[in-house]
From Swiss-Prot:
This is Polyhedrin. The lineage of its organism: Viruses, Viruses incertae sedis, Naldaviricetes, Lefavirales, Baculoviridae. Pfam families: Polyhedrin. The keyword Acyltransferase does not apply. It comes from Bombyx mori nuclear polyhedrosis virus (BmNPV). The keyword Chaperone does not apply.
């Protein structure tokens, strides 16, 4: 019904209420959209059985080359209902000989290589045979430089270590990546400044605790390593000239 109103300045006007009018194009589009959704739901029902399976999107397996640096291997005893600190970034994790050998092998001078990510990997193995228990792990990425972590803590909301008893943590900060392109030259300038300026400026320094769900004290072989995810670039020009090159 039209809505009549009187305006003395312009005379009688007619105002129509558009509440009951629909755009014809909109009606057709909505009908096609509903039809498409119904067909899409029928198609999706064919894949309902696959909902019982899990597929992990693991950046560790993505593009790039993985270069592993083993920091140390050692045996630790872990008491029940407790977790032991295994990574505290003391001097033994950064032995100059270990790092020099790693950089020489993994970052040759002839390539420009960018560090896309760094993973801390802890591989855990029971030293005694016929033991039936699962490994537990807990970590923190950010902590104050003055904070001194406890060597042993009680088990509080840990996560179970997954496949192959390997616990892996991405250390990349928000945004990811490392701006240094020529790792070899940066390392050879100064070992100490390389670790502090290149590694810890761009990646987190985590603390990691390991435990078990066993009711007895267990002896664990722990291997801790850093895995560098590397993107390689071809050099702009050869570094050597002559018939041998």
């Amino acid at each position: 019904m039209p809505n009549y109103s009187y305006n003395p300045t312009i005379g009688r006007t007619y105002v129509y209420d558009n509440k009951y009018y629909k755009n014809l194009g909109g009606l057709i589009k909505n009908a096609k959209r509903k039809k498409h959704l119904i067909e899409h739901e029928k198609e999706e029902k064919q894949w309902d059985l696959l909902d019982n399976y899990m597929v992990a999107e693991d950046p560790f397996l993505g593009p790039g080359k993985n270069q592993k640096l083993t920091l140390f291997k050692e045996v630790r005893n872990v008491k029940p209902d407790t977790m032991k600190l295994i990574v505290n970034w003391s001097g033994k994790e950064f032995l100059r000989e270990t790092w020099t050998r790693f950089v020489e092998d993994s970052f040759p001078i002839v390539n420009d290589q960018e560090v896309m990510d760094v993973y801390l990997v802890a591989n855990l193995k029971p030293t005694r045979p016929n033991r039936c228990y699962k490994f537990l792990a807990q970590h923190a990425l950010r902590w104050d430089e003055d904070y001194v972590p406890h060597e042993v803590i009680r088990i509080m909301e840990p996560s179970y270590v997954g496949m192959n008893n390997e616990y892996r943590i991405s250390l990349a900060k928000k945004g990811g990546g490392c701006p240094i392109m020529n790792i070899h030259s940066e390392y050879t300038n100064s070992f100490e400044s390389f670790v502090n300026r290149v590694i810890w400026e761009n990646f987190y320094k985590p603390i990691v605790y390991i435990g078990t769900d066993s009711a007895e004290e267990e002896e664990i072989l722990i291997e801790v390593s850093l895995v560098f995810k590397i993107k390689e670039f071809a050099p702009d020009a050869p570094l050597f000239t002559g018939p041998a090159y």
